[in-house]
From Swiss-Prot:
Keyword Nuclease listed: yes
Region span, PAM-interacting domain (PI): 1102-1388
Binding annotation for Mg(2+) 1: 10, 763, 767
Annotated positions binding Mg(2+) 2: 10, 767, 990
Keyword list, A-Z: Antiviral defense, DNA-binding, Endonuclease, Hydrolase, Magnesium, Manganese, Metal-binding, Nuclease, RNA-binding
This protein's encoding gene: cas9-2
Class of this enzyme: hydrolase
Family per record: Belongs to the CRISPR-associated protein Cas9 family. Subtype II-A subfamily.
Biased composition range(s): Basic and acidic residues: 1100-1109
Organism from which the protein derives: Streptococcus thermophilus (strain ATCC BAA-491 / LMD-9)
Domain of life: Bacteria
Gene Ontology molecular function: DNA binding; endonuclease activity; metal ion binding; RNA binding
Signal peptide extent: none
Protein name: CRISPR-associated endonuclease Cas9 2
Compositionally biased spans, kind Polar residues: 1116-1129
């Protein structure tokens, strides 16, 4: 039997570190068998390693391509339906017509008939184009003419309408004469007033319509409309909406008090994403006003289209397009004449050079209208007499094309209007048109409802439609074949996600009245107030909360702090009220209540709890469906409750978004003792006033236990762990890490002879710790300072600049001391004394909440002071004496937004008794105990995998402890014992973290077994009394000293030093827990192992990479046909289209590589030659290869194939000199070219690791020790440099770069310490690795070393892997290996 052991895991988004430890903290090693054809049969390996992999990605790219394919397929089908109707009649006139149209884009040699697509002869073709320069000329002619037209022309006009049929946003009847701008503007105003609680109105809306239709610039339109509303400012939010509506860009940053720019532009392709981002900051409540503004913008745009002088025409759109064509023609002639007079050179650049943004590039589609206007404006501004052109450019009405972005505002009804005119006129001459009129119209108007979804049959992952009968679906039989009601139900089930806490329950809509009520009470429950004669802040009681909801939340959409103050004063007579837990206004609201009240107009009905189910069902329907017909159908069941007018108004309402919680969680599950639901507690929780998170984690209530029980995996799911992980909340990246970690644990158990581990310790990386928003915020420091100091009335930013700086910018403000200096207006935060800006390094940065309790290094927890001792006690917040003196100043900083409410609260906490023992215990405990839901899910998966037996009470019998640990504990352990981590050196740090997790967790639980309820997943009733037994003060002492068991001595704040025993023991059992010499020596020894199992996960590629972003089978954009004799390899746009004639797609993405042993014919004499070589298999070719591998390779020119070995991306090769390479890809179009990565890991001794740790942090001005250490050990850089150079010589092979580096290093003594550090390890705060770019695993990269540019090493070739190379297949841990000596292949 194997000895007892534990497993440590460090799970990230692109790595999993792992380690096996024994009871004495050692990492065992095992002699592992090696399979394959090499002489190596066994290798001794340490049970310590890391699995690296490419991060999981979202399905967005795949989804976008899939929807585009469907759109094009359906468009093609519409054309085929029309051809089917025309086919019999057309055959009697011209039986090759459709064939010629299909061949129209083919080169002349490939056409099956005449090269003239419409009439088949030059004379008629020319006459057609002379009479009808654009398709719109033809459409207008046919719509207005009473003459019999050629059937081919009728088809062309109808096909154009069916192909580009317009949007379906407007329901019901619509024509060009009822495009009501005034009504749309009133709708926008109503919504704006409701959301922003204003009362804007416009008496003369006709005036507004005249302004938007006038031929003036967009800016002038906005200004004129704004003047119709005298109370509105040019800088206000209404003005920004007007900018949007007239077609300009708006910025809502100031309006919503955001840190970053929030630009929106209706005509931008990214508008939907930009709006989604903005709503993410400000809330979905505002989505309606943007929706109404967009509708108004579309109406204005459409009115601009349809402004024609010919009132008799039945083709208003075509008339507008003809007008645009004529204006373009006339303006082009004027522009050509004008520019010709400037110079011939300018004329040629504008009209002949398509590489510029001039007319040649614009008309050829290589530059867009916006860039063309910018180019032209700049050119024309230099010359006189260009006012006509410049005015039209300002109106965006110059040289417009027929097809532009604003065509998207045309509804399908406009095309239908013209279609009906043509059919009515021509049906007199072609009876089949009269007979099929409804069918033809149906082709244009038919749209598959989104709730029916894709119509695929069989095992499609993306289709859910339910059929009544099994036959081909057409626009005319859709209603008979598809069961719309059942499909809608399937859509609901598919659309609604599951509760994070109760995985079997569906979440509520975001606008559910229950969900909104929950959010309101959850926010209210943490509001506190203080008034005159009150000693401390107190929470609102149950009656007060109910009153506020009834009187304010149900009376207005946005409730503010003033409302609460007004209530407390009016009802309770309080004066001098101050609030906490709310900034100006509540985030939550009962917006749905107000919507329904406006529609139903029955407050009693809404307030009656017995109607809750009806209201929730209505909101659910309005969230799920957009289709008015389906909404009406589903609301029809309430006809006996509401009258028709109410149901009609309801059917027009639409909600978006889903909450995160279910009705059952909020108001379903009940506490076993009290019988209360979570909502009940939020409304009335006595004096506790716990919020949602506190309620579900409170051991005194049964919610926590019920949630845990609900999360247990069913037996039917346990077999398919991949599906279970897939269903977890979280990103694809973190899920991939979880899945790999479970595979690693399975393999380690196998390696350990099948014996289960004593414990598994899990630490999980936080995702996106450095988000774009975070980066942006750090870069916005200057802007925020300028704004806040201006508010304070301070000129310090301009007047006080450090002597060593010429100006203050965002870079300079990354220095926390300088930033704090300005945030504090140059004052000591505790004394108010002036600080000297040129002596900032002499001052202390003090942590408001001491680091002993909270490791918070954010600006919110830091102040700059002349001496930290001025705060008062070192184990508490600043003293009451300091608060009394400085509170007024701090309040000024708060009002100017130089400090946050949280910072102010912590600074003034002494007024409320300072840090209580409960506060301190809570701070410390939160840093020790992992609370993230995703980590709990992983712990649950492992717990149910290994502890699946039950006792007689149906409780899990836990033989394997699943321990979750926060990274702060290991970070503290590393810091205390100088076990430095430097990520740039190699990938070992993931394995080391996993090992240290296991060590720290094991030692702590041996010493303090009563900590199991804190760290071990599951139910531990025997220790539950531990929490109640210890007082808060005892907890503080216990938690803050928890890591002291590893230290020999502890230094106290008062200067005393307490010695601890050399060997820590468990006080109850006497068992030895931690020997501070031998056990620490063991840890140092393990971290110094040069042999760590590093595996890069090999994977078949399902997508390529395009500038670092996932792409499809090849580059998305078509490339033009290659020049004659070009070697460029393209994939045809269609299988039957030769890319040499028609162009195609470049950048073919590879899936994997095969190693082929066989023969090929070489040279002109076709000499048979034996080969062993790589052949890339593209994602495109993969299906054909899998169908018949041998035949596929024979077609590639191979003969007598003896052997095929498939090699996924990152397959590992070891050369005879010990250097390792990973095969990233071989081009499928040229097997002599490919990408080979470095595969060795450099190992450094601890003295070099320590040097580099300090070197990476040399710019840290708070801790000068980093610089001092590097200055004292500068000589070690020389030794390190030559060690790295030797590694390069032996394993990397970049010998030319080695010489370049050697030459650059000769002058190293002349370089500053900062240059040396950034050259060796990369600049502080950067992801660049400096000199370690040369040695690190993966693709080569260029870098700079001591001022010399070192180019990317590109000399690895595919053939280099075939000389004396051994192919190494590794298992997920790297412990199992199969080695194949390529030289011995074929020896049987």
């Amino acid at each position: 039997m194997t000895k007892p052991y534990s497993i440590g895991l460090d799970i990230g988004t692109n790595s999993v570190g792992w380690a096996v430890t024994t009871d004495n903290y050692k990492v065992p090693s095992k002699k592992m068998k090696v399979l394959g054809n090499t002489s190596k049969k066994y290798i001794k390996k340490n049970l310590l390693g890391v699995l690296l992999f490419d991060s999981g990605i979202t399905a967005e790219g795949r989804r976008l391509k899939r929807t585009a394919r469907r759109r094009y397929t359906r468009r093609r089908n519409r054309i085929l339906y029309l051809q089917e109707i025309f086919s019999t009649e057309m055959a009697t006139l011209d039986d090759a017509f459709f064939q010629r149209l299909d061949d129209s884009f083919l080169v002349p040699d490939d056409k099956r008939d005449s090269k003239y697509p419409i009439f088949g002869n030059l004379v008629e073709e020319k006459a057609y184009h002379d009479e009808f320069p654009t398709i719109y000329h033809l459409r207008k002619y046919l719509a207005d003419s009473t003459k019999k037209a050629d059937l081919r022309l009728v088809y062309l006009a109808l096909a154009h309408m069916i192909k580009y049929r317009g949007h379906f946003l407007i329901e019901g009847e619509f024509n060009s004469k009822n495009n009501d701008i005034q009504k749309n503007f009133q709708d926008f105003l109503d919504t704006y007033n409701a959301i922003f609680e204003s009362d804007l109105s416009l008496e003369n809306s006709k005036q507004l319509e005249e302004i938007v239709k006038d031929k003036i610039s967009k800016l002038e339109k906005k200004d004129r409309i704004l003047k119709l509303f005298p109370g509105e400012k040019n800088s206000g939010i209404f003005s920004e909406f007007l900018k949007l509506i007239v077609g300009n860009q708006a910025d809502f940053r100031k309006c919503f008090n955001l840190d970053e720019k929030a630009s929106l532009h209706f005509s931008k392709e990214s508008y939907d994403e930009d709006l989604e981002t903005l709503l993410g900051y400000i809330g979905d409540d505002y989505s309606d006003v943007f929706l109404k503004a967009k509708k108004l913008y579309d109406a204005i745009l459409l009115s601009g289209f349809l402004t024609v002088t010919d009132n008799e025409t039945e083709a208003p759109l075509s008339s507008a397009m003809i007008k645009r064509y004529n204006e373009h023609k006339e303006d082009l002639a004027l522009l050509k004449e004008y520019i010709r007079n400037i110079s011939l050179k300018t004329y040629n650049e504008v009209f002949k050079d398509d590489t510029k943004n001039g007319y040649a590039g614009y008309i050829d589609g290589k530059t867009n209208q916006e860039d063309f206007y910018v180019y032209l404006k700049k050119l024309l501004a230099e010359f006189e007499g260009a006012d006509y052109f410049l005015e039209k450019i300002d109106r965006e009405d110059f040289l417009r094309k027929q097809r532009t972005f604003d065509n998207g505002s045309i509804p399908y009804q406009i095309h239908l209007q013209e279609m009906r005119a043509i059919l009515d006129k021509q049906a007199k001459f072609y009876p089949f048109l009269a007979k099929n009129k409804e069918r033809i119209e149906k082709i244009l108007t038919f749209r598959i409802p989104y709730y029916v979804g894709p119509l695929a049959r069989g095992n499609s992952d993306f289709a859910w439609s339910i059929r009544k009968r099994n036959e081909k679906i057409t626009p005319w039989n859709f209603e008979d074949v598809i069961d719309k009601e059942s499909s809608a139900e399937a859509f609901i089930n598919r659309m609604t996600s599951f509760d994070l806490y109760l995985p079997e329950e569906k979440v509520l809509p975001k606008h559910s009245l229950l969900y909104e009520t929950f959010n309101v009470y959850n926010e209210l429950t943490k509001v506190r107030f203080i008034a005159e004669s009150m000693r401390d802040y107190q929470f609102l009681d149950s009656k007060q909360k109910k009153d506020i909801v009834r009187l304010y939340f149900k009376d207005k959409r946005k409730v503010t702090d003033k409302d609460i103050i007004e209530y407390l004063h009016a009802i309770y007579g309080y004066d001098g009220i101050e609030l906490k837990g709310i900034e100006k206004q509540f985030n939550s609201s009962l917006s749905t209540y107000h919507d329904l009240l406006n529609i139903i107009n029955d407050k009693e009905f809404l307030d009656d709890s017995s109607n809750e189910a009806i209201i929730e069902e209505i909101i659910h329907t309005l969230t799920i469906f957009e289709d008015r017909e389906m909404i009406k159908q589903r609301l029809s069941k309430f006809e006996n409750i509401f009258d028709k007018s109410v149901l009609k108004k309801l059917s027009r309402r639409h909600y978006t978004g889903w909450g995160k919680l279910s009705a059952k969680l909020i108001n379903g599950i009940r506490d076993e003792k009290s019988g209360n639901t979570i909502l009940d507690y939020l409304i009335d929780d006595g004096i506790s006033n716990r919020n949602f998170m506190q309620l579900i984690h409170d051991d005194a209530l049964s919610f926590k236990k019920k949630i845990q029980k609900a999360q247990i995996i069913g037996d039917e799911d346990k077999g398919n762990i991949k599906e279970v992980v897939k269903s977890l909340p979280g990103s694809p990246a973190i899920k991939k890490g979880i899945l790999q970690s479970i595979k690693i644990v399975d393999e380690l158990v196998k390696v350990m002879g099948g014996r289960k581990p004593e414990s598994i310790v899990v630490e999980m990386a936080r995702e996106n710790q450095y988000t774009n928003q975070g980066k942006s915020n750090s870069q916005q420091r200057l802007k925020r300072l300028e704004k806040s100091l201006k508010e304070l009335g301070s000129k310090i930013l301009k007047e006080n600049i450090p002597a060593k700086l010429s100006k203050i910018d965002n870079n300079a403000l990354q220095n926390d001391r300088l930033y704090l200096y300005y945030l504090q207006n140059g004052k000591d935060m505790y004394t108010g004394d002036d600080l000297d800006i040129d002596r900032l390094s002499n001052y202390d940065i003090d942590h408001i909440i001491p680091q002993a309790f909270l490791k918070d290094n954010s600006i919110d927890n830091k102040v700059l002071v002349s001496s930290a001792s001025n705060r008062g006690k070192s184990d508490d917040v600043p003293s009451l004496e300091v608060v009394k003196k400085r509170k007024t100043f701090w309040y000024q900083l708060l009002k100017s937004k130089l400090i946050s409410q949280r910072k102010f609260d912590n600074l003034t906490k002494a007024e409320r008794g300072g840090l209580s023992p409960e506060d301190k215990a809570g701070f410390i405990q939160r840093q020790l105990v992992e609370t993230r839901q995703i980590t709990k899910h992983v712990a649950r998966l492992l717990d149910e995998k290994f502890n699946n037996k039950k006792d007689e009470n149906n409780r899990a019998v836990r033989t394997v402890k699943i321990i979750t640990l926060k990274s702060t504990l290991v970070s503290q352990f590393r810091k205390d014992f100088e076990l430095y981590k430097v990520r740039e050196i190699n990938d070992f740090h993931h394995a080391h973290d996993a090992y240290l997790n296991a060590v720290v967790a094991s030692a702590l639980l041996k010493k303090y077994p009563k900590l199991e309820p804190e760290f071990v997943y599951g139910d531990y009733p025997k220790y539950n009394s531990f929490r109640e037994r210890k007082s808060a003060t005892e907890k503080v002492y216990f938690y803050s000293n928890i890591m002291n068991i590893f230290k020999k001595s502890i230094s106290l704040a008062d200067g005393r030093v307490i010695e601890r025993p050399l060997i820590e023991v468990n006080e109850e059992t006497g068992e030895s827990v931690w020997n501070k010499e031998s056990d620490l020596a063991t840890v140092r020894r393990v971290l110094s192992y040069p042999q760590v199992n590093v595996v890069k996960k090999v994977e078949e590629q399902n997508h390529g990479l395009d500038r670092g972003k996932p792409k499809g089978l090849f580059n998305a954009n078509l490339s033009s046909k290659p020049k004659p004799n070009s070697n460029e390899n393209l994939v045809g746009a269609k299988e039957y289209l030769d890319p040499k004639k028609y162009g195609g797609y470049a950048g073919i993405s590879n899936s994997f590589t095969v190693l082929v042993k066989g023969t090929i014919e070489k040279g002109a004499k076709k000499k048979i030659t034996n080969v062993l070589e790589f052949q890339g298999i593209s994602i495109l070719d993969r299906i054909n290869y899998r169908k018949d591998k041998l035949n596929f390779l024979l077609e590639k020119g191979y003969k007598d194939i003896e052997l095929i070995i498939e090699l996924p991306k990152y397959s590992l090769f070891e050369l005879s000199d010990g250097s390792r390479r990973m095969l990233a890809s071989i081009l499928s179009t040229n097997n002599k070219r490919g990408e080979i990565h470095k595969g060795n890991q450099i190992f450094l001794s601890q003295k070099f690791v320590k040097l580099l740790y300090h070197a990476k942090r040399i710019s840290n001005t708070i801790n000068e020790n980093h610089r001092k250490y590097v200055e004292n050990h500068k000589k070690e850089f020389e030794e390190l440099f030559y060690y790295i150079l030797e590694f390069n010589e032996n394993y990397v092979g970049a010998k030319k770069n080695g010489k370049l580096l050697n030459s650059a290093f000769q002058s190293w003594q002349n370089h500053s310490i900062d240059e040396l550090c950034s050259s060796f390890i990369g600049p502080t705060g950067s992801e660049r690795k400096g000199l370690f770019e040369l040695t690190s695993r993966g693709s080569a990269a260029d870098f700079e070393f001591l001022g010399v540019k070192i180019p990317r090493y590109r000399d690895y070739t595919p053939s280099s892997l075939l000389k004396d190379a051994t192919l190494i297949h590794q298992s997920v841990t790297g412990l199992y290996e199969t080695r194949i000596d390529l030289a011995k292949l074929g020896e049987g």
